[in-house]
């Protein structure tokens, strides 16, 4: 086997890719011979390195599936055959080979290519993804649809070993076997977490298991032995024993799949041969390929976590989120430090995360308190109910989770935590617009779906110090509590070193002006204060979404002509809706302007670009207020004082 060339550095200049430059669709790829396919894989890896270096983006996963991507588009008739990528981090080579090569420098940028497969972007993107573990269910649906329509097309799901830890993946596997649909599930095992048994014998056996001859012989033998149950059982046990010597596929065989593998995911000729054999088979098939994340780039091979994604090269690559510490700490850093500090004070604290140790800044906690740290893998539902069980018996669980992923555990949040009024603190990271990853990762809805749950305490800090104090407040609260904070850095507020808490339901008057009051919920406070200084508005940092500071709202409503609510959450059902509901309950009718995320999915781009697009930057806020004041025939006052 020809081994992939290992790059030592990311190309700064566009590499010479004469073969790749001629490939604008997989149909052209299928005209190549074996030697040309190997050359194409090399050029594809070189171009992927170059393009991500120029734009920034997900890195290691795509490098690891170059050969698999080429083989899939060569063996199958895409897009007629449905190819579904799980999560989508590994789909960059797929995008390059399906007519988007020249657009790759725009990936994750405003109005450019999306970070993940999107149905709106290409017919080759058969299913939109971003969250994990959805591919098998989606591909199974496509396989069943093909059968209902009497169409011969194939359905293929490519899923990583990390995504296979989620319950949804096993739900789909269990159902797939029952349907007997023509579905191929490819396990991209890039951590060797299921098996290390890769070599000549297993490769040979994989080819045998995938061959049409073997499967015809097996089916014919079963028919012959149907009348002799004892011989049938002996044959079954012999086959299972043979497979068990070289393949770890017992689980998948028991689920009803024909298991094939493991095979080397970087052996392109072997992949093509195996896939060509598999596509002739009927029923659920399971192919286990072993790959190396970051394959072909030395630094990524040695540090696959650090090189999961990179920033744009300027002029040398910086590993995303692992470069020199910023002058101002990230909100996640504030949480990570608070968690360690609180754990030192309270031995009952337990930290839980669904596979977000690095992103949620739990690394230090996991090292210092390993017996109280639980990474449950990609299993958000389990994470929340695990926390509920801990809380039932005296532990104090803290669930560190991204806003977008908490959506996946909504029933557990209500049924297992809130109804029982259990002491669980949710540290909700990536609230609001997260930027380049787009709508699948935006934290646009948490205030809305949390606010309607009884017993919940909900807080949104405006700076670093409030974040720390709110975490303490939520931790000490009797019942479920949530602190939602954005991605990135805060404004640079001084942080109190202790473990102080806030008075529950108490807002903070930040600036006293006249006529118009901005009730701010969360991290948009600096923009609100800037607008208020220009126009002499009052600004209140509300802090608490539930319970609201009702006395503050009544005071502001009685002394101002226009009330503005500001939040980085969808307007529908958000914090502003809570203010309006309270005013209505008090029989107060007054002009209220709700500023927040519109009723649409916000596409990818830099956070500053997106804030401007939706009118949540300082200028957009000022313009919206000015427009409303004009409609009310009110003029802006010009003097005021900070509170």
From Swiss-Prot:
Mg(2+) binds at residues 161, 190. One of its GO terms (cellular component) is cytosol. Its EC number is 2.2.1.7. The keyword DNA-binding does not apply. It comes from the Bacteria. Catalyzes the acyloin condensation reaction between C atoms 2 and 3 of pyruvate and glyceraldehyde 3-phosphate to yield 1-deoxy-D-xylulose-5-phosphate (DXP). Pathway: Metabolic intermediate biosynthesis; 1-deoxy-D-xylulose 5-phosphate biosynthesis; 1-deoxy-D-xylulose 5-phosphate from D-glyceraldehyde 3-phosphate and pyruvate: step 1/1. It is an enzyme of class 2 (transferase). It catalyses: D-glyceraldehyde 3-phosphate + pyruvate + H(+) = 1-deoxy-D-xylulose 5-phosphate + CO2. Its cofactor is Mg(2+); thiamine diphosphate. GO terms for biological process: 1-deoxy-D-xylulose 5-phosphate biosynthetic process; isopentenyl diphosphate biosynthetic process, methylerythritol 4-phosphate pathway; terpenoid biosynthetic process; thiamine biosynthetic process. SMART domains: Transket_pyr. NCBIfam families: dxs, PRK05444.2-2. GO terms for molecular function: 1-deoxy-D-xylulose-5-phosphate synthase activity; magnesium ion binding; thiamine pyrophosphate binding. Pfam families: DXP_synthase_N, Transket_pyr, Transketolase_C. Homodimer. This is 1-deoxy-D-xylulose-5-phosphate synthase. Thiamine diphosphate binds at residues 89, 130-132, 162-163, 190, 297, 380. Belongs to the transketolase family. DXPS subfamily. It comes from Hahella chejuensis (strain KCTC 2396). The keyword Transmembrane does not apply. Keywords: Isoprene biosynthesis, Magnesium, Metal-binding, Thiamine biosynthesis, Thiamine pyrophosphate, Transferase. PANTHER family: 1-D-DEOXYXYLULOSE 5-PHOSPHATE SYNTHASE-RELATED, 1-DEOXY-D-XYLULOSE-5-PHOSPHATE SYNTHASE, CHLOROPLASTIC. Binds 1 Mg(2+) ion per subunit. Binds 1 thiamine pyrophosphate per subunit.
């Amino acid at each position: 086997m020809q081994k992939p060339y290992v790059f030592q550095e990311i190309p700064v200049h566009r590499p010479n890719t004469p073969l790749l430059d001629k490939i604008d669709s997989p149909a052209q790829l299928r005209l190549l011979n074996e030697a040309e396919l190997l050359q194409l894989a090399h050029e594809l890896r070189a171009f992927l390195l170059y393009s991500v270096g120029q734009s920034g983006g997900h890195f290691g996963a795509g490098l690891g599936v170059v050969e698999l991507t080429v083989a899939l588009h060569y063996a199958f008739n895409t897009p007629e055959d449905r190819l579904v990528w799980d999560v989508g981090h590994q789909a960059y080579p797929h995008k390059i080979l399906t007519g988007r090569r020249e657009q790759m420098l725009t990936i994750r940028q405003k109005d450019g290519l999306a970070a993940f497969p999107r149905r709106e972007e290409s017919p080759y993107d058969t299913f939109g993804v971003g969250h994990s573990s959805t591919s098998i269910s989606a591909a199974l649906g496509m396989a069943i649809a093909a059968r209902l329509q009497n169409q011969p097309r194939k359905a293929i799901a490519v899923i990583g070993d990390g995504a296979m830890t989620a319950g949804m993946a096993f739900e789909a596997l269990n159902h797939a076997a029952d349907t007997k649909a023509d579905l191929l599930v490819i396990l991209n095992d890039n951590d060797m977490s299921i098996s290390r048994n890769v070599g000549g014998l297993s490769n040979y056996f994989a080819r045998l298991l995938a061959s049409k001859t073997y499967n015809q012989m097996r089916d014919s033998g079963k028919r012959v032995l149907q009348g002799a149950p004892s011989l049938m059982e002996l044959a079954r046990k012999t086959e299972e024993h043979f497979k068990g010597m070289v393949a770890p596929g017992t689980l998948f065989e028991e689920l009803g799949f024909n298991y094939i593998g493991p095979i080397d995911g970087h052996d392109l000729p072997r992949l093509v041969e195996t896939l060509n054999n598999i596509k002739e088979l009927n029923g659920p098939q399971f192919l286990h390929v072993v790959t190396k994340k970051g394959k072909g780039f030395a630094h990524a091979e040695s540090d696959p976590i650090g090189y999961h994604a990179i920033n744009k090269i300027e002029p040398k690559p910086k590993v995303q989120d692992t470069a020199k510490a910023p002058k101002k700490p990230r909100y996640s850093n504030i949480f990570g430090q608070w968690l360690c500090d609180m754990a030192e004070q309270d031995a009952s604290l337990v930290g839980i995360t669904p596979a977000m140790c690095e992103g949620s800044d739990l690394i230090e906690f996991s090292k210092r308190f390993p017996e109280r740290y639980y990474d449950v893998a990609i299993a958000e539902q389990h994470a929340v109910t695990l926390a509920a069980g801990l809380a039932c018996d005296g532990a104090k669980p803290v669930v560190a989770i991204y806003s977008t992923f908490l959506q996946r555990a909504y029933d557990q949040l209500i049924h297992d935590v809130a109804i029982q009024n259990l002491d669980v603190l949710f540290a909700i990271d990536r609230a609001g617009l997260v930027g380049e990853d787009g709508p699948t990762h935006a934290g646009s809805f948490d205030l809305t779906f949390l606010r309607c749950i009884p017993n919940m305490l909900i807080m949104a800090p405006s700076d670093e110090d409030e974040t720390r104090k709110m975490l303490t407040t939520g931790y000490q609260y009797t019942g479920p509590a949530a602190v939602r904070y954005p991605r990135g850095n805060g404004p640079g507020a001084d942080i109190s070193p202790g473990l102080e808490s806030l008075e529950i339901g108490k807002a903070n008057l930040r600036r006293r002006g006249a006529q118009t009051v901005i009730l701010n919920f969360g991290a948009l406070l600096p923009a609100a204060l800037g607008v208020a200084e220009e126009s002499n508005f009052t600004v209140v940092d509300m802090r608490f979404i539930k319970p609201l500071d009702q006395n503050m709202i009544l005071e502001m409503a009685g002394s101002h002509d226009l009330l503005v609510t500001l939040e980085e959450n969808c307007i529908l059902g958000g914090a502003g809706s809570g203010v309006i509901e309270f005013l209505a309950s008090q029989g107060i009718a007054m002009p209220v302007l709700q500023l927040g995320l519109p009723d649409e999915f916000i596409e990818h781009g830099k956070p500053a670009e997106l804030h401007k697009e939706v009118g949540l930057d300082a200028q957009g806020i000022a313009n919206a207020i000015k427009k409303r004041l004009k409609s009310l025939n009110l003029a802006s006052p010009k003097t005021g004082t900070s509170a």
